[in-house]
Amino acid sequence: IKLSRIFGFEIIDQSNFYIPTSNKDGLKNPSQIGKESLIIPMGKTEITRPVKSLDIILRTCASVNMLTQTKKRIFEKDKSEYSLKTLNSITNSINNNKELFNKIHLKVTIIDHNSNQEILSKFNEILKNQFFQSEVLKLDLDLYSKQIDKINEEGKEVSKNQISNMSNIHQSFEIAKNCGDLIYFVEDDYIHKLDAIEEMIFAYERISSQLNRELILCPSDYPYLYNSLEKSYVFLGNKYHWRSIEETLCTFLTSKTLINKYFNEFTSTSKKEHYPFEKPFHNIYKKELCISPMPALA
């Protein structure tokens, strides 16, 4: 064991995957946040880009069923059900690894527009007595709607629902400018797996350290991205594989560094309705690496 440590090797007991050189259970997560990524059988990757903090910004509007469509949502439930389940899934995913989030600063912020008091009370009830910081903010619609071109890229009038959505996106980017490190922008119709947040943090550290660059992570593996033949790079995260993509919707994780670098491009989605809506994001992904998990985390 002493010789293995000197030469940087790990010993694994094949009968139970115990790692005596590190005194770890290989069946659990042997990686150490901010220090090393340990993947069986690939070995150790030193973390040169540690995650210092994570801000999760959830945009909610429990009163609007579908933003730009008239059809019903899957399962045909009230929109508030999707908003509440999204928040519940995020808090459950965070609590799935409290040890990880005790080592980095974590905050959950909700920017809400037009949800009734009953739903807001339920948001606060879910966030009450959690070990991480949280707050529920009201969308400043008057401030941000003034900055929106009311005629979209197709020459049509922008709908009221879209104006509130674009304003919410703008406010979330303004908040992100004052965050510490990573920011996860989330729409209120994504149900997260228990290991979703943990995987995104460990994958970001590992892949960013290997490539020596900042990243954009999308938690979903969108089926529509398989409709065309495109080259894709595949990376090993913590427990999932990740592949490079050039399109996302408005739910993604990235760093404050990239937000500041492309702030005008990011906020252009909240000033002009493009087609597709996320086109400015896609232009950024032509210059920066965006990856998504296989299979999806949310």
Where are the predicted features?
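Active-site-proximal specificity loops/subdomain of glycosyltransferases
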Residues: 112-180
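Conserved catalytic core of nucleotide-sugar-dependent glycosyltransferases
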Residues: 149-152, 162, 176, 182, ...
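Phosphate/oxyanion-binding active-site loops and adjacent basic polyanion-contact surfaces
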Residues: 76-87, 160-169, 192-196, 273
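N-proximal low-complexity "stem/linker" segments adjacent to membrane-targeting elements
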Residues: 2-92, 99-101
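Short loop/turn segments at strand-loop or loop-helix junctions that form parts
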Residues: 54-69, 112-113, 136-146, 219-222, ...
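Alpha-helix termini
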Residues: 93-103, 129, 175, 204-212
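C-terminal catalytic/acceptor-binding lobe
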Residues: 18-30, 256-298
